[in-house]
């Protein structure tokens, strides 16, 4: 039977369809126009397959794809042109690589005959992208498109997830080929799901069974592996208290009795202090980043360290491991749990409460229940979290707004935190929230931003307007680049070198885009205006006038051990 002859652009549409893609974030341009022409036939009428979201900047397309992937568990897709269109996505690609987020970036390229000639909007995208993604590939023949797309999705979502970049020369889009679907089930020299080592499983279980003061560190690997139930079974059988990384905050429900709080530089006092008192430390799907460990030379030296991860390169990279368990935590956790003896650690768990009470009295009550002065970020977060009853998705930008909203937001459901953890990308929040709204349209998405971060992606108000994206935006406006200002106060003698912000009139900007807006300047109006925001259909911008010199505590200073965490900052 004669096979159907189609263009490369049509082949791309079919390959994406076969991967189950429904949503694409993109921006057209010269070198990708044939693909967008093919896309036109798949976005309307009886043949509608894709929902294309026209962003206002290609970096936003990548971040939106990240947000979509984080909350949905599916691969996010963005489609852009060559040259600046492609390079604009690279911050998002690097961000996705750092945070193990599965996205596929498809970029146009000049024709093969023009490669290397410095043609208009030409860039060696594969060469630039290779160090910051799992796989970068230039598709030089239309008959390779189905294979390359299938391989890209397999690599992006398997093992430790991450970004893939496909470079598509213009003639590959217009040349024809016989259509042949493809399905990738393995890639040579790539082993995304290693077989569990029985000896490592037994060694880990033996250490845990002998532990008097075990402590688990729960990372995003639990979310990526969909191992939430396996985690609960593990923790509850052995009665192990747990701290959560920034990216792992919704891997364990906030109010679970074994949840002791957030890890890290601005995490919970108890989780940081008790890291230095445990006798067995169990790291689950986390990478011991510098923001968690403080000074690595002093980190948990008294403890035996068990590290569960799907990526062998993380073992002994930052912290010396006594037992390394390589594999997907959805398999490794139940394998260990089966060998555990039921245990109780009541006194050990109670000792966390002592530190938690100190933090509550000296930090939390002041943050969320202030009685006078300007609004604080903590009280705004607390009111929004209470109003959404822990059911919302939290998306935040980078800086003080990120730390405070992550500290005080409550999580009941999995895949509920979307943040730029490893790369710390300002401007991430707004486009990521747009992507999250399309990833889980049935859930409320709350996006916390500072006045610095919002202005790095404020053009995406256009996307929100056009698509009527129902994102609830909370702008914490302290008229400063607050996190940098705090460090300037701590380390540079209060010399505020270019960190004070002259802000535009956000009411006028919101009005120009047709987005409902309100502002809170008095805390007596806060709850009412938050409830109004949440009850208003569609998008909403709520600006909160925040105390300009508010600091984020607790804080572990750079170069300090985690048990040197401060509950107050003294200048």
Predicted regions and their residues:
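Phosphate/pyrophosphate-binding active-site segments
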Residues: 1-3, 143, 206, 302-398, ...
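N-terminal alpha/beta PP-like core and its mobile active-site loop of ThDP/TPP-dependent enzymes
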Residues: 2-347, 383, 387-390, 470-473, ...
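Active-site diphosphate/adenylate-binding microenvironment
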Residues: 9-13, 17, 35-39, 356-436
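Active-site nucleophile and cofactor-binding loops and adjacent substrate-binding regions
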Residues: 27-29, 52-63, 78-85, 140-141, ...
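Thiamine diphosphate
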Residues: 106, 114-121, 316-318, 324-326, ...
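Generic enzyme active-site microenvironment
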Residues: 165, 307, 395, 448-449
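Short, internal active-site loops enriched in acidic
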Residues: 170-173, 401, 548
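Conserved short loop/turn motifs at secondary-structure junctions
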Residues: 219-224, 369, 450-452
């Amino acid at each position: 039977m004669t096979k159907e002859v189609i263009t490369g652009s049509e082949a791309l549409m079919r390959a994406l369809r076969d991967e189950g893609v429904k949503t694409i974030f993109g921006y057209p341009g010269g070198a990708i126009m044939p693909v967008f022409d093919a896309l036109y036939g798949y976005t309307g009428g009886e043949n509608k397959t894709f929902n294309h979201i026209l962003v206002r900047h290609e970096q936003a397309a990548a971040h939106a794809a990240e947000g979509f992937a984080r909350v949905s568990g599916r691969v996010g897709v963005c489609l852009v042109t060559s040259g600046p269109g492609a390079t604009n996505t690279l911050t998002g690609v690097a961000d996705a690589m750092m945070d193990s987020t599965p996205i596929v970036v498809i970029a146009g390229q000049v024709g093969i005959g023009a490669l290397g000639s410095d043609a208009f909007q030409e860039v060696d995208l594969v060469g630039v992208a290779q160090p910051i993604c799992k796989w970068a590939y230039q598709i030089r023949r239309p008959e390779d498109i189905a294979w390359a797309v299938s391989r890209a999705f397999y690599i992006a979502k398997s093992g430790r997830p991450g970004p893939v970049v496909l470079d598509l020369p213009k003639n590959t889009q217009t040349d024809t080929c016989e259509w042949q679907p493809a399905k990738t089930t393995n890639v040579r020299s790539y082993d995304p799901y290693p077989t569990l080592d029985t000896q490592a499983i037994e060694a880990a279980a033996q250490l845990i069974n002998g532990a008097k003061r075990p402590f688990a560190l729960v990372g995003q690997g639990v979310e990526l592996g969909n191992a939430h139930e396996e985690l609960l079974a593990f923790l509850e059988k052995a009665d192990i208290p747990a701290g959560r990384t920034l990216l792992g905050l919704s891997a364990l429900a906030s109010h679970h009795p074994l949840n002791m709080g957030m890890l890290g530089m601005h995490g919970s006092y108890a989780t940081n202090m008790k890291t230095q008192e445990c006798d067995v430390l169990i790291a689950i799907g986390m990478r011991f980043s510098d923001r968690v460990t403080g000074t690595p030379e002093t980190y948990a030296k008294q403890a035996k360290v068990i590290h569960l991860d799907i990526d062998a390169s993380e073992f002994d990279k930052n912290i010396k491991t006594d037992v390394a368990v390589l594999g997907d935590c959805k398999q490794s956790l139940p394998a260990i749990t089966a060998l555990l003896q039921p245990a109780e650690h009541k006194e050990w768990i109670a000792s966390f409460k002592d530190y938690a009470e100190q933090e509550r009295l000296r930090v939390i009550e002041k943050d969320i229940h202030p009685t006078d002065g300007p609004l604080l970020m903590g009280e705004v977060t607390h009111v929004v979290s209470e109003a959404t009853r822990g059911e919302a998705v939290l998306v935040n930008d980078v800086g003080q707004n990120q730390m405070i909203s992550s500290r005080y937001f409550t999580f009941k459901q999995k895949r509920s935190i979307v943040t730029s953890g490893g790369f710390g990308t300002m401007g991430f929040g707004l486009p990521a929230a747009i992507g999250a709204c399309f990833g889980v349209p049935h859930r409320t998405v709350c996006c916390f931003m500072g006045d610095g971060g919002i202005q790095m992606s404020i053009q995406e108000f256009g996307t929100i307007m056009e698509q009527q994206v129902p994102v609830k935006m909370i702008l914490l406006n302290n008229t400063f680049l607050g996190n940098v200002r705090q460090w300037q106060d701590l380390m540079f003698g209060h010399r505020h070198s270019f960190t004070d912000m002259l802000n535009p009139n956000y009411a006028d900007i919101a009005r120009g885009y047709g987005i409902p807006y309100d502002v809170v300047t008095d805390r007596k109006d806060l709850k009412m205006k938050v409830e109004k925001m949440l009850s208003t259909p569609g998008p909403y911008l709520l600006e909160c006038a925040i105390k300009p010199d508010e600091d984020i505590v607790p804080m572990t200073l750079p170069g300090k051990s985690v048990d040197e965490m401060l509950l107050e900052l003294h200048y």
